[in-house]
Amino acid sequence: MRNNMQCTLFFLSCMLAFCVLFARGEAAGQIQDADFSYRGITLGDAEQTLKQAWGEEDTEGTQMVHGIHLRTFTYGDVVVSTTAGGKKVVDISLMGDAYRLRQDVRYGATSSYIFRVFGKAQRQFMDDHTCYVYDEPMNAHRRLVLNLDAEHGALLSVRMTMLPLTEEETEELARSPYSPFCVQDFARDFIEQKEIDVTALPSAAPVRLGGYGT
C-alpha cells in the first residue's frame, strides 16, 4: 500500500514538473529580428540585394495592394514584393510546403508549437484567412502574418510584411507626419491613386531603417 502511494506521488510530481516546464516553454516564445528575414533577405533590403542573393526570378510582375504600387518577383513558392518607387523589399510571402522558419516552424505546424516559438496571439480574420499577426516590438511597421487552416489551426502560409494590412491602416499611414522606412513611398502611391493633390507632400528624406544603422 505504501509503495503504491509513493509511486502515485512520484508520478504526480513528474506530471507537475512537466506541466511547469511546458508552460515556461510557451511563455518564452517571442518575436525576433530573424522572423523578418528569409534565406538572407530582410524586409527593407534593396531590390538589387534580392537579385544578387537569389538570382533571376521565375516571373516578374506588378500589383496594387491598398493603393500601393508594387513590383513582384516569384521564386518557386516564394513571392517577394518591392515598392515600385523606392525598390525596397516590403513583403515576403511563403507558400507551398517547403519553407522553414525559425526553430523549424513550417507548413502544418500546430498552434501550440507556433505559440512556443513566437508567443501567444489572438486569431484574426484577414483577406479570407484565419491568421495570427505578430508585430516587431522595435518596429511597428514590420509584421509576421501566419495564415492558418480554419478548422484545425495548422499553419498554411506565411507573410513577412511592411505593408498596411487594411485600408484604414493605409490611410493613417499616408496622413502620418512621421515617415518610418518605406512609408514615404506608401503615402505617395496611396494619395496619387486617390487622385489627391500631392504637390505639398514633402520629399522623402534619408531615414533610419527601423532605428538601426544609417
What are these regions (language model features)?
Residues 1-11:
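Bacterial N-terminal signal peptides that target proteins for export
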Residues 34-40, 98-105:
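Second-shell loop/turn segments in exported
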Residues 88-100, 107-112:
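A low-complexity, Ser/Thr/Gly/Pro-enriched, surface-exposed linker/loop concept
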Residues 31-33, 55:
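Short, flexible domain-boundary/linker segments around small modular repeats
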Residues 10-20:
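Bacterial N-terminal signal peptides
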Residues 42-85, 106-214:
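A cross-family detector of function-defining hotspots
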Residues 22-29:
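Sec-dependent signal peptide cleavage junction
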